[in-house]
A protein has these predicted regions:
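Class I SAM-binding transferase module
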Residues: 2, 9-11, 22-26, 31, ...
Length: 331
């Protein structure tokens, strides 16, 4: 039965696979080996970042503050990306009459329903299991007053935040509906990563393997509080997205000029800023000792450069609505 569940998941029948796994576990509750396989199966489709994101107290406070400020009695809230259900419960706690939250992963949706019931919000929070583009207005129960999401990745765009917001604003939201976060920005700065070259290949057993370095990804995730990273310029916004717009945001390119503070630069570091509303900002700017559930992304240069204080250096980028490419312009 568990083997069949795996085959069904591989075939994209996620809800049926989950139900079959649950049935197998229920039929043999004393089977320790089956229980172990069941735990592996249930967790196999759940990204580990779910266990990190809810521990970000600054992120939690930013969302909670914005929700409390926005929600008025009687409002309906739509959330895209349930996860643990924490933001949906925050919305209900802030006074929303109804919260509908979309979760495309059946195992996560099931866990979220259990969490929401356990915390006493089952009468006001409803989990829709499916991608938000499968939701209908009838299932939502009418247009919503507030849209809240956290489907942003380290580069902001990787979880299809743009198409999800555009469809929601067109099909599900009332005119003038508030969106939390209202805007998302891609921020960049010149930087030095003191460990950038650690994994580069050189001579191994007398053989020069350095040409293989051309195949190494130039993008590396770095925790924002890691001491290996030093900013070598003031930050700037490479892209700024209005999440409340129903207009399609086309693929685009952008450039800005960074004023170097001086010193060795071997890459460009990118992070995100979320303007929850006009008063509340969440930003995971790299700095010693800071923490964030999102990492910065270090874009290594082909070769390091030495900069002088005040030197102007061009940084450019492009996005295709889903992914992001960043580079230093020719000097």
């Amino acid at each position: 039965m568990m083997h069949l569940a795996k085959l069904m998941r591989k075939d994209g029948q996620n809800e049926q696979a989950l139900a079959l796994c649950r049935k197998a576990l229920a039929l043999a509750p004393q089977d320790a080996a089956l229980a172990a396989r069941g735990r592996t199966f249930l967790s196999g489709d759940v990204p580990n970042w779910h266990f990190v994101i809810v521990t970000d107290a600054v992120r939690n406070a930013a969302y909670d503050t914005a929700l409390r400020r926005a929600i008025k009695p009687g409002m309906r809230v739509l959330e895209i990306g349930t996860g643990t259900g924490i933001l949906a419960m925050m919305a209900a706690r802030a006074g929303a009459a109804e919260v509908v939250t979309c979760e495309m992963n059946p195992a996560i949706a099931e866990a979220a329903r259990s969490i929401i019931e356990r915390n006493g919000y089952g009468d006001r929070v409803r989990v829709f299991c499916g991608h938000s583009d499968k939701l209908t207005l009838d299932e939502l129960g009418g247009r919503a007053d507030i849209l809240v999401t956290e489907i942003v990745s380290n580069n902001l765009l990787g979880e299809d935040v743009l198409p999800a917001h555009e469809k929601a604003m067109r099909d599900f939201m009332k005119p003038g509906a508030q969106v939390i976060p209202a805007r998302g920005r891609v921020r960049v700065a010149l930087a030095e990563d003191s460990r950038c070259d650690e994994k580069k290949m050189g001579k191994v057993d007398g053989f020069d393997l350095s040409p293989f370095n051309n195949l190494r990804t130039p993008e590396q995730l770095i925790r924002v509080g890691h001491e290996r990273l030093t900013l070598r310029s003031e930050p700037g916004d490479l892209f700024d997205f209005d999440f409340a717009s129903e207009l399609v945001c086309a693929a685009a390119s952008s450039k800005l000029t960074c004023r170097a503070t001086g010193g060795r630069v071997n890459g460009i570091v990118q992070w995100i800023a979320l303007d929850m509303d006009r008063e509340t900002l969440y930003e995971n700017r790299p700095a010693p000792g800071t923490t964030s559930c999102w990492s910065s992304i270090f874009h290594a240069l082909p070769a390091p450069i030495e900069t002088t204080p005040g030197q102007l250096i061009g940084v450019a980028g492009s996005h295709d609505r889903h992914s992001l490419t960043i580079w230093m312009e020719d000097r």
